[in-house]
Amino acid sequence: MNVIDHVRDMAAAGLHSNVRLLSSLLLTMSNNNPELFSPPQKYQLLVYHADSLFHDKEYRNAVSKYTMALQQKKALSKTSKVRPSTGNSASTPQSQCLPSEIEVKYKMAECYTMLKQDKDAIAILDGIPSRQRTPKINMMLANLYKKAGQERPSVTSYKEVLRQCPLALDAILGLLSLSVKGAEVASMTMNVIQTVPNLDWLSVWIKAYAFVHTGDNSRAISTICSLEKKSLLRDNVDLLGSLADLYFRAGDNKNSVLKFEQAQMLDPYLIKGMDVYGYLLAREGRLEDVENLGCRLFNISDQHAEPWVVSGCHSFYSKRYSRALYLGAKAIQLNSNSVQALLLKGAALRNMGRVQEAIIHFREAIRLAPCRLDCYEGLIECYLASNSIREAMVMANNVYKTLGANAQTLTLLATVCLEDPVTQEKAKTLLDKALTQRPDYIKAVVKKAELLSREQKYEDGIALLRNALANQSDCVLHRILGDFLVAVNEYQEAMDQYSIALSLDPNDQKSLEGMQKMEKEESPTDATQEEDVDDMEGSGEEGDLEGSDSEAAQWADQEQWFGMQ
């Protein structure tokens, strides 16, 4: 047993730090005396040393050593062709123990992906002949092609994975996301479904996620619910997470939160989807719950985007936009495909007046998730903020045609129509259609109430809001109802509605302002005193604003490493 055998055994045992130290010393010895180790032995040393560097996350250094190893292997191959084997018995086991050249190239590709050099990763894997590609190589290639927008080679690679491993479910999802028909994907798994027991659910699973990737949320929800109700798949965390995400996409935030909570109870260490859950909690004004969720996720892992997004949502809804921007950028650094991180950063940029930069982020979110309406909503809000009503109208019409005429797309189109006096009647028609489909859809109710307020039809608005609040409780709806009640001189009930709104979201400034305005009108003698107090407090508020400006500058200094500009 020679020293190379000892290095190999330590590598196999996972003693990476020991391998790194010993292989470094042995490589130096080899450089000083080239005759000390044979070419195959030096190749092995370089590979084992590179593997130890990879384990220590020194990816650039590892790539350098892997490259040297491949050069050594190339020279070794040329030598073996020129000089045939002499029959030396010692060389036979040595050649059998040589690390696979294909595995070395795969490790190099992994390094390149960690360094965000996807083109180099594709180039190194493309150099491997198709017949020699293992399933993991095809899977990595498929994901890299998909990320680069090269759909055809991505589909080919995913299909090759399924040919070798017909139960590779992530490869199935990859194909469905690239618009491959569910029936075609299912046909690739038919043999294994028929031969392996207890896999009768797989065809339904494929059907469900085919609906997901075509944006048919209602059929996707019903199909996954039918799966989840089966005794063998009941309480599956992945299915519950998918259901929660689908309810969110469909605008049913209440059921989305319930499913996320159910999944979280089953798996306290769940990270996937928690960014959306945190966003929903923040929207409801449950900032303390958001803060607790963020802390818990950071304790699980700070190397995922989700905890950073959750903390960013807490900052955003606390009106600390510069910090939300920083946290969103950090999340993008960790996962450039995080749609929620892109939306967070885009929203922060928009609220800071950097609309053109925000537009870039929302467009990237749309590219990654073309079936998610909230991505389009963010982009349209940017267009409206910059008075680009024509662009907003074109985008809203495209969404309406692409995702179909449902309550959400009708409301989005109506929102843009409300911005133009010429299209007010069209907005009214669209909102009526949306509310016919879903009378409880909050965004449609809010926009219809806004239209009724413009027309001063307060009684109609009150009836609309009471009907919407019959089966749900929402801060914004209670606040708007309070505003309408003030308009018809129902002050006591208006005060009650503002109080309910503030109990749901203590940070809702508009409800607080409505309540304070009523109190001033009821007590005119105290008004001047309150104004004096406000003036005295004003200096303190100015100090806070200055502090937030300095904080903005502090976070802005760090934009040099932000995920996307």
From Swiss-Prot:
Gene: ANAPC7
Keywords: Acetylation, Cell cycle, Cell division, Cytoplasm, Cytoskeleton, Intellectual disability, Mitosis, Nucleus, Repeat, TPR repeat, Ubl conjugation pathway
GO biological process: anaphase-promoting complex-dependent catabolic process; brain development; cell division; positive regulation of mitotic metaphase/anaphase transition; protein branched polyubiquitination; protein K11-linked ubiquitination; protein K48-linked ubiquitination; protein ubiquitination
Main location: cytoplasm
Organism: Homo sapiens
Function of the protein: Component of the anaphase promoting complex/cyclosome (APC/C), a cell cycle-regulated E3 ubiquitin ligase that controls progression through mitosis and the G1 phase of the cell cycle. The APC/C complex acts by mediating ubiquitination and subsequent degradation of target proteins: it mainly mediates the formation of 'Lys-11'-linked polyubiquitin chains and, to a lower extent, the formation of 'Lys-48'- and 'Lys-63'-linked polyubiquitin chains. The APC/C complex catalyzes assembly of branched 'Lys-11'-/'Lys-48'-linked branched ubiquitin chains on target proteins.
Stated consequence of mutating residue 22 to R: Loss of homodimerization
Protein name per Swiss-Prot or TrEMBL: Anaphase-promoting complex subunit 7
Pathway: Protein modification; protein ubiquitination
Family: Belongs to the APC7 family.
Molecular function per GO: enzyme-substrate adaptor activity; protein phosphatase binding
N6-acetyllysine PTM positions: 229
Biased composition (Acidic residues): 528-549
A Pfam family it matches: TPR_8
Annotated spans, Disordered: 513-565
Superkingdom of this protein's organism: Eukaryota
Subcellular location: Cytoplasm, Cytoskeleton; Nucleus; Cytoplasm, Cytoskeleton, Spindle
UniProt keyword annotation of Cell cycle present: yes
Annotated disease: Ferguson-Bonni neurodevelopmental syndrome: An autosomal recessive disorder characterized by global developmental delay, impaired intellectual development, and hypotonia with early motor delay. Additional features may include dysmorphic facies, mild skeletal abnormalities, and hearing loss.
A single GO cellular-component term on record: cytosol
